[in-house]
Every structure is written in structure tokens, then in C-alpha cells.
Amino acid sequence: MEDKISEFLNVPFESLQGVTYPVLRKLYKKIAKFERSEEEVTKLNVLVDEIKSQYYSRISKLKQLLDESSEQKNTAKEELNGLKDQLNEERSRYRREIDALKKQLHVSHEAMREVNDEKRVKEEYDIWQSRDQGNDSLNDDLNKENKLLRRKLMEMENILQRCKSNAISLQLKYDTSVQEKELMLQSKKLIEEKLSSFSKKTLTEEVTKSSHVENLEEKLYQMQSNYESVFTYNKFLLNQNKQLSQSVEEKVLEMKNLKDTASVEKAEFSKEMTLQKNMNDLLRSQLTSLEKDCSLRAIEKNDDNSCRNPEHTDVIDELIDTKLRLEKSKNECQRLQNIVMDCTKEEEATMTTSAVSPTVGKLFSDIKVLKRQLIKERNQKFQLQNQLEDFILELEHKTPELISFKERTKSLEHELKRSTELLETVSLTKRKQEREITSLRQKINGCEANIHSLVKQRLDLARQVKLLLLNTSAIQETASPLSQDELISLRKILESSNIVNENDSQAIITERLVEFSNVNELQEKNVELLNCIRILADKLENYEGKQDKTLQKVENQTIKEAKDAIIELENINAKMETRINILLRERDSYKLLASTEENKANTNSVTSMEAAREKKIRELEAELSSTKVENSAIIQNLRKELLIYKKSQCKKKTTLEDFENFKGLAKEKERMLEEAIDHLKAELEKQKSWVPSYIHVEKERASTELSQSRIKIKSLEYEISKLKKETASFIPTKESLTRDFEQCCKEKKELQMRLKESEISHNENKMDFSSKEGQYKAKIKELENNLERLRSDLQSKIQEIESIRSCKDSQLKWAQNTIDDTEMKMKSLLTELSNKETTIEKLSSEIENLDKELRKTKFQYKFLDQNSDASTLEPTLRKELEQIQVQLKDANSQIQAYEEIISSNENALIELKNELAKTKENYDAKIELEKKEKWAREEDLSRLRGELGEIRALQPKLKEGALHFVQQSEKLRNEVERIQKMIEKIEKMSTIVQLCKKKEMSQYQSTMKENKDLSELVIRLEKDAADCQAELTKTKSSLYSAQDLLDKHERKWMEEKADYERELISNIEQTESLRVENSVLIEKVDDTAANNGDKDHLKLVSLFSNLRHERNSLETKLTTCKRELAFVKQKNDSLEKTINDLQRTQTLSEKEYQCSAVIIDEFKDITKEVTQVNILKENNAILQKSLKNVTEKNREIYKQLNDRQEEISRLQRDLIQTKEQVSINSNKILVYESEMEQCKQRYQDLSQQQKDAQKKDIEKLTNEISDLKGKLSSAENANADLENKFNRLKKQAHEKLDASKKQQAALTNELNELKAIKDKLEQDLHFENAKVIDLDTKLKAHELQSEDVSRDHEKDTYRTLMEEIESLKKELQIFKTANSSSDAFEKLKVNMEKEKDRIIDERTKEFEKKLQETLNKSTSSEAEYSKDIETLKKEWLKEYEDETLRRIKEAEENLKKRIRLPSEERIQKIISKRKEELEEEFRKKLKENAGSLTFLDNKGSGEDAEEELWNSPSKGNSERPSAVAGFINQKNLKPQEQLKNVKNDVSFNDSQSMVTNKENNIVDSSAAGNKAIPTFSFGKPFFSSNTSSLQSFQNPFTASQSNINTNAPLRTLNIQPEVAVKAAINFSNVTDLTNNSTDGAKITEIGSTSKRPIESGTSSDPDTKKVKESPANDQASNE
């Protein structure tokens, strides 16, 4: 056992000596299980191979069937073609015959015509004769001539009769030919029907085959899908395998590194080992008598040393784990990159393959798509250009901001660089410290390992010393170290080992590996074994790698070949298509040429040209057809090749799938085995880890007990030294103790006796079980033999049944053939009858013709009687009459004969038809009966199949029974193991008995309990045996029922056989009666033929002779059939005899075995399921093999059981010997205790010395560890500080970057919104301008036409304009709602709208009042004032731009100087100063230009007013909606005034409010900016068409995100708008000027800082820039 374990684990034999026996036993079990699993794997592989072979055989059979069906189809087609050719030939032959007959008829008709001409001549002659009655002389001549003519007439009549007879004969021939033709047609119809039936059959066969093929294809597709799924699963497994292999490689590398480090450490500490060897020598000399104390102290020191692990191991482990994770992540990244590369390569390959064969249509579609894409790309390019231009403009405006951002980023980069440098320095220091720590830890670990190894060596030495002492003491006391019993047992073992039959290889292995003289030799052999195993493993891996490579190469080659073939086929196809297209184009071009040339050519040359063209077309068509034929042939060939290729590919795929499935199974098995090995290893490690702890615990317990005993001994010695007088009192106590000990020994012996009794009972149970198992096996073998015998009987019966069936089939075929022949004869008779009827009709027609001719002749004779003498005519006429009467009589007699024949034939036909009908009915009834019987038999077959399935279902039960036996054997093994454990426990009990009675009693109770468990197990086994017997009885009952069914089916079959025989006898009787009737009919026909000797009768006679011949042939056939029947009956009798014999044998076999009658039920199913029988045979063979294997296993198990029993007996002997030795040792202990006292003092001295040395070393190590800990803690603290600093810097940098990103995002969003608003406003402007232009044109036309138009028209126009105004108002409201951003803005809007409505109402009223006054006044000074306004506006704008630029620069400088918190008072002062300055400037400019600004409301002045309104730099954003509304009203009022032909001066002074915005710090100074304008204007949209001011536009009620401080608290907006709009009308001179002033609002932030005051909606005052000195902004900048 130990040898096997050491061989399996590749471990030296000595290392297993320290392991306990139960552990070894478990290991041995696991190894046995592993070997069994390997055997099962091999069996499974064999089964898989067998299944594969069966599958391939089935596929080959299916292919053969397909090939046979295709061959049958081809043969049927060939037969069809042959029959068609024969038909065509017969048709042509009959046509020729018909043509010949037609020619003969034509000749006969011409002869008839000649006869008629002669008759006419005769008639004319008679007429001439009647005319020349007076000429007697001539009469004589005429008489002579008449006689001559009569003779000629007679001759001609004879000729006519001959012609008629010829014609009749020809007609008969014709009729016969027609009949033959009809027969041929009928035969043709029959053949066609057969062909149609055959074609139907072929169609059905094709349908079935196609369905079968479809099913096969579906299966193929399923298999392909399964293959794909398996392939994907294999890929997944391969990837996992790769990952695992990588991890394994990494682990191997780590192991190698560890081994290298270990070797280095060994080399380093080899010197120290040499130093400590001296110490070991001293210990060996001193520790001869102190082995127990040494072992205890060594264990204690080992424990102390094991507790001295450093605290830094956790940190190092974490670092190692992180490194491993890093490596794993890198490997995963590389793997993913490789996968991505592979996928891209595959996609490129697919793209290249798909882009190989583009067609012309695809190219055209691609060109169209590319054109569209080009157009889209151009549009996108233009859009991008426009966007780029806009972006460049925006960049020009935002250059200062970008510069500031760059500076900030540079500063941040500098800070980041500093922080990274700091980090690098910190990381370098950290790495250095880590390296130092790792080196120190390695040193500490090395020291600990050395200490541990030294301790182990010390322990080993102590044990060796102990063994030496024991051996020396044994040698001193006795001559040999072993007892005689031990020597005898050793000899037995050696003899038994020699008895085993070994192979040559095994003998060599035992010689080289098992037998050894020294431990060194054993170690050397183990090393050799390891090297051999590693070499073999490397060879195996290399072989597997080569196999994988070769397989991959083969697969790649096949795939490449398939791809090349497909590409070639596609190229050929494409070439053919191009050729066809070229030919089609040529044909079309020729047709077009023909059509064009036909129109141009002349009428004479048209025909010739057409002919030439037609020839060309025909030639081209012929070429086309030939090319098509060639192409079709090529295509067919290619298709065939493709099909062949596909088939081969399918075959390859199937083989590949099978291989891959097998591969997958093998891999799964490998994985399972690996898992099992890992599990075993884990269990081994657990057990190994458990063993030292267990040993340690036992040693501690023993040490404690020893220490206690020592203490007691000391105390006793002390008491003995003090109290020698009390020894007498202790003597009785000693005697009592001895008595107790004797009692314990007796109890022990009793227990041993009971154990032996239990073992004997157990052995008896085993023997019973083995005998029962042997009986069962014998029964199984007998059953198998019966099965084989019955199968052979079955096969013989099947053959007999097949022969009977073949006979029956031949009889049925013969009956069908006879029926077909009779039917054919009936048809031929019917055709003959029809022919005869036609001949009778012809004869009747001829008789009628003759009657007519007789009448004519009578008439002629009467006429002649009148003219000629009666004497001359009477004799001739009488002769003729007599001849005619004779002919008539003959004709009548013939007719009567024919009628009699027809009647007799009709009667015979009717009788035959009746008989045929009866026979058909009988046959139909029989067929129906047979069908019913067939259905019944099929049902019986299905039932029998079900029973067969049940029997087959019983087979796995038998297998389960066998498995159950195996399980029981395993249970027995487990029980044996338990018994061994029991024995071990009993040994422990024997040792504990010496110490304490109580322990012995408890162990005795536990053994009793375990004995109870054994008895329970025995009871369970008996129950299992009873269950098996019950199952056997069940199977027997099922077999009995199956046998009864077989008997029933046999009875049915006998009854059916009797019915068939009766039917055969009745059929034979019917055929004999028919034969008698046929003979009677033939005799009748012969009588009629004797009476009538015509040609027709001769034909009939020939027909009947043919029929007789056929009758004779049929009779001969009948006789042969009877002979065959007799032969079949004999066979049947022999079969019945054999069946009776078989039944007798069956009854005997039933009596003997009663289990093998079920299989006889398969005698009907074998014709259809021969293949299944073969499969069953194979399965049975496999089962027999498995049974044999199981029996062999059982035998092996029994052998092992016997071995174990022998081992148990040997162990029991050993137990007895050990007990004896224990008793000897107990005596020796007393001697050793006295020696112990002497050794104690020496040992204590040595231990003190060692302790002192070890204490010094320990103190040094502890000091070093504390120093290292201090360093580590300081380094960790420094690391933590640096990490905190770095995290802070990171956070600051990230916050700043996030803030800048948010600002940029906000700016971009605002820009996009403003652009959208700008686009909308521009669209509205264009729309309104278009409306204005339309209105102007309408007004001009109206001025020319409607000077004398009344005011009613003006009112209508006014209404329409008012409606338009209302619509525009609604649009304004929509626009306002869209631009509404906050609640404050909405309130402002509401106020503005109310004020706007009020102003509009007031102005409309004023306008209506002043309209009448201003109608008669003219508009003279328009141009002058417009020019002055434009020049003033431009100058003022330039000045304002210069001032704003200067102030922006000043504001930037002030901002650079002052970035700290400004107060609110300072902001208010700045706002008030700015307001005052703007108001003063506005007043000055108004005063300067007050005298010159008096002009009328026209287009130019309106536009100037608009521009001034919108170009005013200090106008607030909140006022703009009202300005827009005013502008729209103004535009709508202009055409009203022009309609009324206003020629007076109208002037309006617009005083618009100034609104200050608290957010943007914009001072509204529109009143200062606006000059006194004589027109009524409310302003312009947000931006003019010239400027793009939306780029810098900001909503005044939304805080700009460039200076938002997220940390600072939000301030409230105190908006106090005060709007005051005043209007004044000046007629000639402006006298009153209004100044609008607005209160300023508190502003917290400024939005954008653009350079142009026109483009921006905010003020560009430098004082306002100082608002950036807010505390919130300052805090943000500092952060």
C-alpha cells in the first residue's frame, strides 16, 4: 500500500513513515478511485468510438440508398425514352401501311370509274338502238355487236366482282390494320397509364426522397448549429485554457524564483550549518538516555520559534498581491488587443472577399451613392467654412480671454510640474525603503527557515537516538532485535510477494526501484523516477503541441482550398454573365441597325436586305443558343462540382465536428481529472497540515502526563525518604492495585474474544454474500446462454418466415399475372367482336347495293323486253336471276351464321364478364380482409415493439443491478476499512487500559456501539439482497406475460395460415371451372367452323387455336404452381414440425429458466428492423463486455477482501505482540525512571546553556525588528503626508480645470442660443422688410391711381392694416414669451406692454386728430435733413467708439491694479457719475442739433431713427421689446399717412425710458443718445443687418458664467425700472425737447467685455469694469 502511494505521489518511502495509517488508507482509496475513473474514461472513449462508427455506417447506408434511388430514377427515365422511341417507330410504320392502303383504294376507285364509263356507253348504245329500229340490217350487226358487248359486259362484271372482292379483301386488311392500330393505341394507352403510374410513383419517391433530404438537411443544419455552438464553447474553453496556462506559467516562474532564492539562502547558510554540526555531535553523545525530554523541549522551542513571525509580512503580501494583479491586468490587456487585431483582420478579409465580384448594377448604385455623398460633403464643407468664418470672428473677439486662460494654464502646469517632481522624489524614496524592507524580510525569513530546519534535524536525530537505544537494549536482552513471530510474518510477506505473476517490465521496476540496500540508494532512485516522469511529461506536451499544429494546418489548407474554388467559380460565372451581356447587346445593336436601315433602304433592296439580316439573326440566334447551351452545360457542371464540393465540405465539417466534440469531451475529462487531482491534493495538504498539529497535541498531552507522573514520582520519592516507616501501610494498597490491574487484563481479554467473534460473524456474512453473488453470476451466465440460443432459433425462424413470405408473394404475383392475361384476352375478344360487327354492317350495305343494282337490271330488262324479243332475253335473265338468288341465299346463310356466332360470343362474353366481376369481387374482399389482417398485424407489431421497448428498458435495470453489486462491494470495502479503524481503536484502548479503568470502559462502550453499526450494516445488506430478489421476481413475471403474448400471436398466425390455404383451394377450383367452360366454348366454335368454311371463320379458328395454346400453357403453369404449392406445403409442414420442436424446447427452457421467452415476439418485426437487431447485438456485446468487466472487478474486489482479511489477521497478531511488548516496556520504564534522575541534571545544564545563547539571539532579532518597525512607521507617515499633499494639489488642479471648462461650456451655450435668436430675428426682419416694400409699391400705385378715391376706401385699408398690426402684436407676444427667462423679466415685460399699449392708444388718437390738419401740408425738406442726420450719426459713433476703447483699456489697467473687494457705495458712485456724464453729453448734442432737426416722416428719416435707436450704446436690453413694438407700429402707420396724401410736416419727439440692469451694470441713456426726430418711431430689432452684435449679446437678467462664484452667496436683484415715454408733434419747428432720466439699479456682476458698443448689449464703461473687484470673484481667483 505504502509503495503504491509513494509511486503515485512521487514521494520517497521514508517520508510516509511519519503519516498515520488512516491517512494512508484514505490516500490508497483515493488512488484506487482515480484509477477506476481513468478506466471509466477509457471505456467511455471506446463507447464514443463505437457510437461514431455506428453513425458513420448509418450515413454510408443512407448515401447508398440515395445513390440507388438516383440510379433507379435514371433507369426508369431510360426505359421511358426507349418506350417513346418504340411508339414513334410503330406510329411511323402504321402511317406507311395506311398510305399503301389508301393508294390501293384509289386504284380500285379508278377501276370503278372505268366500269361506269362503259355502262354509260352501253346506255347510249341502247338509246341509238331504239332510234334506229327500222334498220333491220343494222339490227343484226347491232345484235352481234350487242352480244359482243354483253360478253364484254360479263367480262367487265367479272372484273368488277374481282375488284369488289379485292376491295373487300383490301377493306378487310384495312380493318385488320385499323384494329391493330386500335390495339396499338390501347397498348399505348396502357403504356401511358403505366408510365403515368410510374411517373406518379417516381414523383412520390422524389417527394419522399426530397422530404428525406430536407430532413437530412435540417439535421445537417441542426448539426451545424450544434457545431457552431460547440465551436464557440470550445473557443471559450480555449481562452479559459490559455488564461489558466498563463497563470500556471506565472506560478511556475514564481516557483522557480522561489527555488532560486531558496538555493541562494541555502548557500548562504551552509556555513552556519557546518558550525552547528559540532553542536549536533555533542547532542548525539549526550542525548542517548534523554530522548523524551529532548523531544518535548524541541517541540516547545519549535512553538516559540513559530510564534516569532515579524509584523511586516502583511504589508509585503499586499505588495506582492498588487504586483500580481498588475501583471494579470497587463496580460488581459494584451489578450484583448490580440482579439481585436484578429477581429479586424477577419473583417478586412470579409471585406476583401465581398469586394471581389461587384456587378455593373452595383457599381452604378455605388456611383449614385458616392455622388450623393459628394454633394452632402460639399454642403458640409460650405457649412464648415461658414462656421469657421464665424468661429474666427468669435476668436478675434475672445483673444484677450484666451490669453488670460493660457497664462493661467501655464501657471497651473508649473504647479503640476512641481507637484510631479515632489511625487517622483517621494516615490523613489518609497521604493528604496520598500526594497530595504523586502531584503530585511527575506533575511528574516531565511533565518526562520534555517532555525526551523535545524529544529527538525534535531528532532530527527532525537528519534534516531531513541531507536538506537531501543535496539541496543533489545540486543543486550535478547540475541535478535525481532521476535520469532515477526520473522515468520516477514518471511510470509516475502513469499507472497514472489508468488505474484509479474511481467518483465514490472520485474525490472521492482529490481530497480523497490529493492534497495540504503536510504541513499532509495533517494537516488526517487530522483531518477522524478526525472523520468518529467521527461515523459515534456515529450507528451510536445507531441500534443505538434498534433494541434498539424490539425490547424490541415484545417487552414481545406478552408483556403474551398475559398479558392469558390472564387474561381464566381469568376467563371462573372465571365459567362459578361459574355451573355455582350451577346445580348450585339443582338440589340443588330436589331437597331436593321430597323434603321429598313427605313433608309429602297423598296427593291428591302427583301434582299431582310433576307440577309434574317440569316444573320438566325446565325446569331444559333450562336446564342449554342452559347446558352454551352453556358447551361458549364453551369450544370459547375453546380455538380459545387454539390460535390459541398458534400465533401459537409463530410469534412462532420468529421471536424466529431473530432472537436471528441476533443471537447477529452478536455472536459482532463478538466475533471485535474479537479479531482486538485481536490486530492487539497485533501492531502489538509491531512498533512492536520497531522503535525495532531502529533503536536498528542505529544503535549503525553508531555503533560509525563510531567504529572514525574511530579508524582518526585513527591513519592520525597515521601519515601521522609516516611520509610509508612511503607508497611502502603503494601496492601499496592496489592489492591495489582488486583485491579489483573481485572483490567481479564476484561481486555474478554473484549478481544468478543472482537474475534464479531470478526468471525462478519467473515461468515461475507462468505454468504460471496456465495449468493456467485449464484447470481451463474444465473446471469445461464440467462445469457439462453438468450444466445434463443437468438439463433429466432434467426432460423425468421429465415423460414421469409421463405414462406417469398412463396406467398410469388403465388400472388402469378395470380395477378393470370388475371391480367385474362383481361387482355377479353379486350382482344371485344376488339374482334367490334371488327366483326363492322364487317356485318359492310356486308349489309353491300346487299343493299346489290338490291339496288338488281332493281336497275330489272328495269333494264323490262325496257329491253319492250324493245327486243322475249325469246332471246328470257334464258339469260333466268340464269342471272338464279345466280342472284343463289348469291342471296348464300349471303343470308352467312348473315345467320354470323348472327349466331355473335350471339354465342355475346353470351360467352357476358358470362366471362360476370365471372370476372365475381372473381374481382372475391379478390377485392380477400384484399380487404388481408388489409384488415395487415392492420391487425401492424397493431400487434406496434404492441410487440412496445413490449420490446419495455424489455430493453429492463436492460438498464440489469445494469443498475450490476452497479448495485459494485456499490455493495464498495460498501464492503468501506466496512473493512471501518473494521481496520476499529482495530486501531482497540489498540489505543489496550494502551489506555493501563492508565485508567474509566477510559477502558468508555472505549468498550464505543466499540459496542460500533459493533451495533456493523450489525445494522449487515441487516441493510440483507435488505438490499431481498430487494434484488424482488426485482428478479418482477422481471420473471414480465417475461411470463411476454411469453403468453407470443403464444397468442402464434395461434393467430396459424389461423391466418389456414384461411390463406382455404382461399388458395377455392381459387384453384374456380380456375378449373373456367377451364371446363373454355373447352366447351372451343368445341362450339369448332362446330361452327366446320359448318362455315369462309376466311373469317378461318381467322376465328386461328384465334381460338391461339387461345388453346395459351390455355395449354396456363395449364402447364398451373401444374407447376401445384407442384410448388405441394413443395411449399412440405416446407410448411417441416416448419410446423420445427416450430413444434421449438415449442417443446421452449417449454423445457421455460421450466428451467422462465426468463427467455420474450425475445420470440420479434419474429414479425425483424423484416423491418434488421438494423435495430444488429444494433441490439452490438449493445448486447457491449453489455456483455461491461458485465465481464464488472465480474472481473468483483473478483478483484473479493481478492482484495481476502487480502484485507489476511492483513487484519496479521494485524491482530501484531496487536498481540505489541501488547506483549507493552508489558515488557512497562517493566523497562521503571528501570528508565531511575536512570532519568541522573540524566536530568545533565539535560538541565545543557538546556540552560542553549537558552542563554538563544535568548541573546532573540534579543538581537527583537531589537532589529523594533528598529525596522520604527523605520517603517516613519516611512509610512511620510508617504501618507506626501499622498495627502498630492491629493490636495490634484483636487485644486481639477477644480480649476472644471471651473474653466464650465465657463467655456456656458459661453458656448450662450453663443449658440444668441445665434439662434439672431437667425429668428433676421428672418422676422426680412419678412417685415418684404411686407414694407410690398406696401410701398402698393402705396405708389395707389397715389397714381386713387387721388379722387373717397375716404371709405381709406377706411378699408386702415382696417386691414390694423388687422396686420394686431397679427404683428400677437407675433410680438409669442416672441416675448419665447425670450422670457425669469419672473422679474416677465413682470418688466407686462409693465412695458401696458405702457406700450397706452402710448399706442394716445398716439393713435393724436394721429387721428392731426391727420386732417396735416393733409394739405407738403414734404419739402426731406433730403437735406436726412444727409445731416447720417453725417452726425457717423461722427458721433466714431467718437463713441474711440471713447469706449480708451475706457476699456483704462478699465483693464484698473482691474489689474485693483482685484480686491470694492464696496457697494463705490459701485453706486461710479454708476451715478456715468449717468451724469451721459446725460450731459446727450443734452449738449441735442442743443447743438436742435435747430436743424425738423423734417417730415418719410422712409429715410424712419430708417435714421431706427439706426439711432439701435446704435445707441447705453440702451438697456430690457427696453428692446417695447422699441420693437414701436418700430412695427411706426412701419404700419407710414402707409396710412401716405394713403391720405399727407404733405404736411409731422414730427414726433420720442422720449424713451432708460432702464438700468443690476446684473450687467448697464446705464440706460437712450434719451441722451437719441436726437429730436420729427417722425414717430419706436425702434429697431435687436441688431441691424450690418452688424453681428448677437455674438456678444447677453441676457441682462442672467448672471454671466465667466465670473460665477459657486461658493459665494447669491445676492438679490433690486430692479427698479422707471419708464417714461413722451411724444410731441412739431409742425415746422421743434420747440420742446424731452429728457428722459432713469434711476440706476444696483449691479453685482458685468457680463462680457466686447470692444464695439454697437454689437454689445452691455455698457463698455471702464468704471463698470471695476465691479470685478467683488469679494466672490476674488475668492474664486485665490482658490
From Swiss-Prot:
Keyword tRNA-binding set for record: no
Motif Bipartite nuclear localization signal 1 — list its residue ranges.
417-433
Query: Which UniProt keywords are given for this protein, alphabetically ordered?
Result: Coiled coil, Cytoplasm, Cytoskeleton, mRNA transport, Nuclear pore complex, Nucleus, Phosphoprotein, Protein transport, Translocation, Transport
Phosphoserine modifications at: S1512, S1670
Where in this chain does the entry annotate a coiled-coil region? 32-176, 233-466, 516-1064, 1099-1491
A GO BP annotation: telomere tethering at nuclear periphery
The GO terms describing molecular function are: ribonucleoprotein complex binding; structural constituent of nuclear pore
Query: What role does it play?
Result: Together with the closely related MLP1, involved in the structural and functional organization of perinuclear chromatin. MLP1/MLP2 associate with the nuclear pore complex and form filamentous structures along the nuclear periphery. Has a role in the localization of Esc1 to nucleolar regions. Together with MLP1, mediates tethering of the some telomeres to the nuclear periphery, probably mediated by YKU70/YKU80 (HDF1/HDF2) heterodimer and show perinuclear location dependent silencing. MLP1 and MLP2 are involved in telomere length regulation but not silencing or telomere anchoring.
The protein, known as = Protein MLP2
Q: Which organism is it from?
A: Saccharomyces cerevisiae (strain ATCC 204508 / S288c) (Baker's yeast)
User: Which gene is the coding source of this polypeptide chain?
Assistant: MLP2
